[in-house]
């Protein structure tokens, strides 16, 4: 049965008429239309159509041959668009929306702006100046470089024949695409496309000149006219071929670029559902099911249902969390955390780096840790529900995935190294929270996004007539595969860039080089980016430095605290890998250097291979805490001893285990752990809302020789917040935890839209 008929077109029109050629506005949104469902002969009768809404469908391209000569406004947001070249026929477009098309990149955006000569509004923004540069600004530069390639290495064949000319054209185009470089690497696809067009046009102009010299009277060129209905007595012809150009505009980072907010609710399935890595996100399911695995899927019918279990419709008493500041209001200063008494932080641990025998399952060499001997005491301070979709107070299904404390700058008053400000993400929102007051200082919302990861960094911002000043920025990403860059202090989302067509699973800044950002994606890759510094207008330049190939989805990234520029550890869905990330080497694409394997892998279990590393963090310069799904414990192991035992002829190296910490026996995956190196703490939440805390002191390290499993120092019970009229809430799963460096606060994120803040008791 045809989805689009003449009757439907007349019904969907805002113009009350019985003639197709009188329709000026047409709404075909949310009809589950595919490209083949658009009948070209029928739609071509809409010769006076000016505004068309095709949002919320499953279109991959605009059908070939569709001519809408009067169309000025087109909305193709929230589709499956892959081919923007199909839009070239709509030459009179002035306004176009392509948000929420997962497969489109910044290269496609540049192509669209170039192909549509009258386009002035793109995704709701005025692009007049950008479009002028894309269409005209850099044509001569590219053209001169292409001509230089021709004059240096090529000439016309003599005599000219179709076969010889085709061979020359192929060689010339390939050489030009290879040799001509312009703009950032992120625009290489667009640049190559432009260079190919310019090279072909230049060669065609040479052959035309050659023909004119040989033939006295020229043959008139046949004009190709586009058929169109007569509007006002004037036929509409296709424009002459335009000279196309590249751009040196900073890729993927327009100044003061806000997070692209869209009104249409997306319907794509999240990449963190059942199979963990979706091959093709589908839009046929109205339910947005968030992360990550079979065990966490639910049968609940609410639109954003929890992927783990059936949704328990529970609420929580909010403390000062319902009043949140609008993200577009003038920014308020991020408060500095108040001073608090703290013990002296841990010094760098000194580990033995002597080569270990492979047969030794547990390393008995003592790691010297200098941490406070007395454990801390924590009490629950706030339970916040601040990530609700559409501000729904009954939203207890949105999963919260990542949190991180704001870094303290060098001029901070707080000598303890602590911070009161934490960023949290989950669902469509990113929140910046003051742990002491429980106030949500800033809240950023991107409809249709599902944030999985975030990271803080302190970068330099240049100032006119003065020295550069440091500012804390926040990077966040998730299902859409784009990194959003935010300066919370001034309440500004200033840029974004696309990392992948698949979702972002994890991100981490290099603490030694604050502009270096690692991003892990669901297409089994880890990218290293340099976002550069910021100018006074928040312009920045993004460049890709490395591509690391993984065998499965990266879930956690950890840089060596003592040498973050040399090696990267990646906990993945199918193992723990180590990568060489030194930029002094020429190879820009790399595979893992070694795989670190654990004793749990030897356990015979047909249902689970225990290779999913869903927790990874450094406890000191050398001691690493990690765990596998279904393991029921946490390993502490030595990085230096493990690497020293590596035989370069083998990819696998057994981890040199220092201790095994008893944890919950749960089958729920992706319950990550956190560490506080300065106080020797490892913390991991479980499926009942409890927090297992391990205080790793010098005395405990002495006992590691026994090889016995060590119990938790303390297990913090779920605080059981009370919802008015409905009693206490059951404990949810704790997806993620974070502690500030001074261990003033411990924050836990749940799979039921609750942020729990614990505070250390002062003595």
Curated annotation (Swiss-Prot):
UniProt keyword Cell division, yes or no: no
Phosphoserine: modified positions: 270, 290
Region (Disordered): 206-372
Matching InterPro entries: Leu-rich_rpt, LRR_dom_sf, LRR_LRWD1_dom, LRWD1, WD40/YVTN_repeat-like_dom_sf, WD40_repeat_CS, WD40_repeat_dom_sf, WD40_rpt
Gene3D superfamilies the UniProt entry points to: Ribonuclease Inhibitor, YVTN repeat-like/Quinoprotein amine dehydrogenase
Protein family per UniProt: Belongs to the LRWD1 family.
Protein name: Leucine-rich repeat and WD repeat-containing protein 1
Organism from which the protein derives: Danio rerio (Zebrafish)
Name of encoding gene: lrwd1
């Amino acid at each position: 049965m045809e989805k689009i008929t003449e009757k439907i077109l007349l019904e969907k029109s805002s113009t009350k008429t019985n003639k197709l050629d009188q329709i000026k506005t047409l709404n075909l949104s949310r009809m589950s239309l595919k490209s083949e469902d658009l009948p070209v002969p029928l739609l071509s009768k809409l010769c006076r159509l000016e505004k068309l809404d095709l949002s919320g469908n499953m279109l991959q391209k605009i059908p070939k041959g569709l001519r809408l000569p009067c169309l000025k406004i087109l909305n193709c947001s929230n589709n499956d668009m892959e081919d923007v070249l199909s839009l070239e026929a709509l030459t009179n477009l002035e306004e176009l929306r392509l948000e929420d098309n997962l497969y489109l990149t910044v290269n496609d955006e540049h192509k669209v702006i170039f192909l549509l000569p009258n386009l002035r509004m793109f995704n709701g923004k005025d692009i007049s100046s950008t479009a002028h540069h894309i269409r005209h600004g850099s044509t001569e530069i590219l053209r001169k470089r292409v001509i230089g390639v021709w004059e240096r290495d090529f000439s016309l064949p003599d005599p000219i024949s179709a076969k010889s000319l085709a061979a020359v054209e192929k060689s010339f185009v390939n050489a030009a695409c290879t040799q001509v470089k312009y703009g950032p690497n992120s625009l290489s696809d667009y640049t190559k496309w432009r260079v190919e067009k310019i090279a072909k046009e230049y060669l065609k102009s040479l052959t035309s000149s050659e023909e004119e010299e040989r033939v006295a009277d020229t043959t008139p060129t046949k004009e190709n006219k586009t058929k169109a209905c007569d509007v006002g007595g004037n036929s509409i012809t296709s424009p002459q071929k335009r000279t196309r150009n590249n751009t040196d505009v900073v890729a993927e980072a327009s100044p003061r670029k806000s997070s692209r907010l869209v009104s249409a609710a997306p319907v794509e399935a999240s990449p963190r559902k059942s199979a963990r890595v979706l091959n093709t996100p589908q839009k046929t399911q109205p339910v947005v099911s968030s992360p990550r695995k079979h065990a966490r899927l639910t049968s609940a019918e609410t639109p954003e249902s929890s992927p783990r279990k059936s949704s328990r419709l529970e609420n929580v008493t909010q403390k000062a969390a319902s009043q949140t500041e609008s993200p577009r209001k003038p920014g308020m200063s991020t408060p500095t955390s108040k001073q608090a008494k703290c013990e002296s932080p841990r010094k760098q641990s000194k580990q033995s780096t002597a080569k270990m025998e492979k047969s030794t399952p547990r390393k008995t060499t003592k790691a010297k840790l200098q941490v406070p001997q007395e454990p801390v005491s924590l009490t629950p301070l706030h339970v916040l529900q601040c990530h609700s979709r559409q501000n729904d107070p009954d939203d207890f299904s949105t999963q919260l995935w990542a949190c991180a404390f704001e870094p303290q700058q060098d001029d901070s008053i707080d000598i303890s190294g602590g911070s009161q400000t934490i960023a949290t993400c989950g669902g469509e929102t990113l929140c910046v929270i003051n742990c002491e007051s429980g106030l949500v200082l800033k809240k950023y919302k991107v409809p249709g996004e599902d944030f999985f990861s975030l990271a803080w960094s302190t970068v330099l911002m240049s100032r006119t007539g003065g020295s550069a000043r440091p500012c804390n920025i926040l990077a966040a990403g998730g299902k859409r595969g784009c990194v959003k860059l935010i300066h919370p202090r001034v309440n500004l989302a200033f840029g974004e860039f696309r990392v992948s067509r698949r979702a972002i699973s994890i991100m981490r800044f290099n603490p030694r080089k604050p502009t270096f950002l690692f991003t892990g994606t669901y297409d089994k890759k880890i990218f290293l980016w340099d976002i550069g510094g910021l100018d006074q207008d928040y312009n920045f330049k993004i460049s890709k430095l490395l591509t690391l190939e993984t065998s499965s989805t990266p879930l956690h990234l950890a840089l060596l605290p003592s040498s973050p520029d040399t090696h990267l550890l990646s906990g993945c869905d199918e193992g723990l890998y180590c990568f060489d990330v030194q930029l002094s080497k020429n190879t820009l694409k790399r595979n893992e250097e070694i795989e670190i394997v654990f004793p749990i892998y030897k356990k015979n279990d047909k249902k689970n291979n225990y290779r999913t590393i869903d927790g990874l963090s450094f406890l000191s310069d050398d001691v690493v805490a990690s765990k596998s799904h279904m393991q029921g414990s946490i390993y502490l192991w030595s990085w230096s001893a493990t690497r020293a035992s590596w035989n370069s002829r083998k990819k696998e190296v057994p981890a040199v285990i220092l201790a095994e910490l008893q944890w919950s026996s749960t089958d729920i995956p992706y319950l990550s752990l956190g560490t506080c190196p300065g106080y020797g703490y490892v913390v991991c939440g479980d499926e009942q809302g409890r927090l297992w805390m391990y205080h790793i002191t010098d005395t405990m390290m002495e006992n590691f020789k026994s090889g016995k499993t060590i119990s938790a120092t303390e297990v913090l019970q779920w605080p059981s917040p009370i919802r008015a009229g409905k009693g206490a809430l059951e404990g949810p799963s704790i997806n993620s935890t974070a502690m500030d460096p001074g261990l003033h606060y411990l924050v836990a994120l749940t799979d039921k839209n609750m942020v729990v803040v614990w505070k250390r008791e002062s003595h």
